[in-house]
Design a protein with these regions (language model features):
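Short, low-complexity disordered leader/linker segments with a strong preference
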Residues: 1-50, 403
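Beta-alpha junction/loop-to-helix N-cap segments that form part of ligand/metal-binding clefts
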Residues: 63-68, 82-154, 227-232, 264
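Periplasmic-binding protein-like
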Residues: 53, 111-123, 143-145, 193-196, ...
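Extracellular/periplasmic periplasmic-binding protein-like sensory domains
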Residues: 262-330, 397-399
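Extracytoplasmic "Venus flytrap"
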Residues: 45, 52-71, 95-101, 123-124, ...
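Segments of small-molecule ligand-sensing domains
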Residues: 316, 320-323, 337-399
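Short, polar/charged alpha-helical segment
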Residues: 61-86, 208-213
C-alpha cells in the first residue's frame, strides 16, 4: 500500500497550535501513537482530550484541506487559551489523506490507535464516505466540515441515519436544488445545460438534483454533458452545449476544473452565465475577471460576515482566510467541542463507549452558534441554516444575497 505523508499538529498546554508537526505515514507510527489495544483508554491522557482532524493537506484539493484544518485549529486554540474543556486541554492529531479514500481510512485507523475520541473530517466527499463506513464500527463522533454527499449522514436506500456522523455544511441535494431554484426563480432562466465530472459523488449529486428541481419548476434542460477524471479538454462538450442555446450552464465541479471550463467556454464562444456549488470556492486566480462576470455559486459563508473570526484567522496565520472552508472548519470544531463539553460535564471518561455516545447525543439535540450561522441538526444530521449566494466583482467573490 502506498504510504502517505501526514502532518500532526498539537495544541500545547498553553494553547499554541504548531504550524507544522511531526511528519509520519498513515500506516506508520510515531512516538506519541498509542497501541491499538489501548486506544480507548489513551483518549484522555492526563489533562488532555485527543481530537482527530483529517483532510487533503497535499494534492489537487489541498486548498480545501488546509482551510478546514486551519479553521478547526483556530477554534480549538481559542478553547485551550480559555482554559480548555473543564480544565482539560485539547490535543490535535492531524492527518493528510491526499484526497484518497483508501488513505483516508488508513489515517482514521491510525488516529483511533493513537487515542482519538472525536473526529473533525473528512473534507471532500469520496474520502469522507469511506471514513463514515469505518467510523460506524467505533461509534466515533464525526463532524465533517464540508463533505456534501447525502450519503455521508443518511442512506436514502435503507432510510438509515449514520448515527455518529454530522456535517457543518449543506448537502449535495440541497445545493443542486437551491441553485435550480435560484436560476429559475431569481434569475429568470428557463433553459439550462449541465456539465459535470462523471463518477464523482459530489459532481453527480449536484447535477442530478439541479436537473430534477429545474425541470419540476417548469424549466428545460437542453443538454447534459459529462467528462472523466483527468480530462483537461472540454471543448467538445462545450461546443455541443453552445449548439443547444442554453440561457445558463450549471457546472457543479471543483475550482481548478471550473477555471479550465470557463476559459475554454470563452474560446468556443459560449458566453452565457455559469452557475456552481461550493466547490467553486477558491476559483479566483483560475479564471479571468471577464470569465467570472455574471456567474453565481452557493456557499456557507460570505467574506465580511464575521470580522472577529476573520481578524483572528489573519492574526494566527498571517494571511486572510483563503475560502469558505475555513469558517466551516471552525464551525465543525465548535460542534465537536459542544459535544465534548456535554460528555465532560457528565463526568465520563474520554474514549469510552458512554463518552462517545454522550458527545453524539449532545450534538444531535444541540444548537450551535456558528460563524456560518446559528444551526441545529435535522433528522438526517444535516444543519438547518440559510445559504449565501455569491457572485464575482472584479474577480473577487462577494455576497449577492442570502437565499
Amino acid at each position: 500500500m502506498k504510504n502517505m505523508i501526514s502532518r500532526r499538529n498539537f495544541l500545547a498546554a498553553a494553547g499554541v497550535v504548531a504550524a507544522a508537526g511531526v511528519l509520519t505515514a498513515c500506516g506508520g507510527s510515531s512516538s506519541t501513537a498509542a497501541s491499538a489495544a489501548g486506544s480507548s483508554a489513551a483518549a484522555a491522557s492526563g489533562d488532555t482530550i485527543k481530537v482527530g482532524v483529517m483532510g487533503p493537506l497535499s494534492g489537487n484539493v489541498s486548498v480545501y484541506g488546509q482551510a478546514v484544518v486551519n479553521g478547526a485549529a483556530l477554534y480549538l486554540k481559542q478553547v485551550n487559551a480559555n482554559g480548555g474543556i473543564n480544565g482539560k486541554q485539547i490535543e490535535i492529531l492531524t492527518e493528510d489523506e491526499q484526497g484518497d479514500a483508501t488513505q483516508a481510512v488508513n489515517c482514521f485507523t491510525k488516529m483511533v490507535d493513537e487515542g482519538m475520541t472525536a473526529l473533525i473530517g473528512d473534507v471532500t466527499t469520496t474520502p469522507t464516505l469511506a471514513v463514515v463506513a469505518e467510523s460506524a464500527d467505533y461509534n466515533m463522533p464525526m463532524v465533517t466540515a464540508s463533505a456534501t454527499a447525502e450519503a455521508g449522514t443518511y442512506d436514502a436506500e435503507t432510510d438509515t441515519v449514520n448515527a455518529n456522523v454530522f456535517r457543518a455544511t449543506f448537502t449535495d441535494p440541497f445545493q443542486g436544488i437551491k441553485m435550480a431554484d435560484y436560476a429559475y426563480q431569481k434569475l429568470g432562466y428557463t433553459k439550462a445545460a449541465v456539465i459535470f465530472k462523471k463518477g464523482a459523488d459530489y459532481n453527480e449529486g449536484l447535477a442530478e438534483n439541479f436537473v430534477n428541481e429545474f425541470e419540476s419548476l417548469g424549466g428545460i434542460i437542453v443538454d447534459q454533458e459529462s467528462y472523466s477524471e483527468g480530462d483537461v479538454d472540454f471543448k467538445t462538450q462545450l461546443t455541443t452545449i453552445l449548439g443547444k442555446a442554453p440561457e445558463t450552464v450549471f457546472c457543479p465541479n471543483y475550482y481548478e476544473e471550473v477555471g479550465q471550463i470557463l476559459s475554454q467556454a470563452e474560446s468556443v464562444g459560449l458566453t452565457v452565465p455559469f452557475l456552481g456549488g461550493d466547490g467553486w470556492d477558491g476559483l479566483e486566480g483560475y479564471a479571468t475577471n471577464d470569465q467570472l462576470k455574471d456567474t453565481y455559486f452557493c456557499a456557507n459563508y460570505a467574506k465580511g460576515s464575521n470580522s472577529e473570526f476573520e481578524d483572528a484567522y489573519k492574526a494566527e496565520y498571517g494571511q486572510e482566510y483563503p475560502n469558505g472552508f475555513s469558517p466551516l472548519g471552525y464551525d465543525a470544531a465548535k460542534t465537536v467541542v459542544y459535544g465534548l463539553q456535554a460528555a465532560e460535564d457528565a463526568g465520563l471518561e474520554a474514549g469510552t463507549d458512554d463518552y462517545k455516545q454522550a458527545v453524539i447525543d449532545a450534538i444531535a439535540s444541540g444548537t450551535i452558534d456558528g460563524i456560518t450561522g446559528t444551526f441545529t441538526f435535522d433528522e438526517h444530521h444535516d444543519p438547518v441554516k440559510q445559504t449565501a449566494i455569491l457572485t464575482y466583482v472584479d474577480g473577487k467573490p462577494v455576497l449577492k444575497e442570502m437565499f
